[in-house]
Amino acid sequence: MTVSTQVSRNEYTGNGATTQYDFTFRILDKSHLLVQTLDTSENIVTLTLGTDYTVTGVNRYNGGKVVLTSALPAGYKISIERSTPVTQEASIRNQGGFFPEIHEDAFDKLTMLVQQAYGWWSGLSLRKPSWLANYYDALNNRIRNLRDPSQAQDAATKSYVDSSDIDLQQQITSNFNRSLRVHDSYISQLP
């Protein structure tokens, strides 16, 4: 058979009742899935096979189901991703019998690994939109855990800008409190 789809990840939103979620791609073993949830506070939890979920449809070309032990709360998201180990387990001997299924599975696994690497590159990495671009595109995603800037051209965190703004506001208030004020509008401003 072939790996006839480029899909290697499915994502769903919980409704508080559903426990079964489809994955629409082939896996060679039930441990070849990475199942994660995202709560409404944007905390990511990696689920454990056998404890948090079970898998049906192993080695089916059109996929199977992840069955959660409890329903995913409303508003939570679930990601089901192929996570194939980077190993080569097919042993092909010289002068041995030719078993097409062994070759087919080995080539399928290579294709799955390429899809997995492509998925990481295309969906998760901060990258330039083109080789010609001189900037990185976050694709409308936030960037977390960024250090405070130390060089003039470094990116600044919200916390750093907020604290700098507070310092500036305090300086302006201090200067304003020491200024001479008159309420008559005909007096011109001092140089």
What function would you assign to each model-found segment?
Residues 1-107, 116, 120-127, 152-155, ...:
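N-terminal assembly/attachment segments of tailed bacteriophage virion structural proteins
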Residues 130-151:
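Small/polar residue-rich beta-strand/coil "junction" motifs that cap repeat-based extracellular fibers
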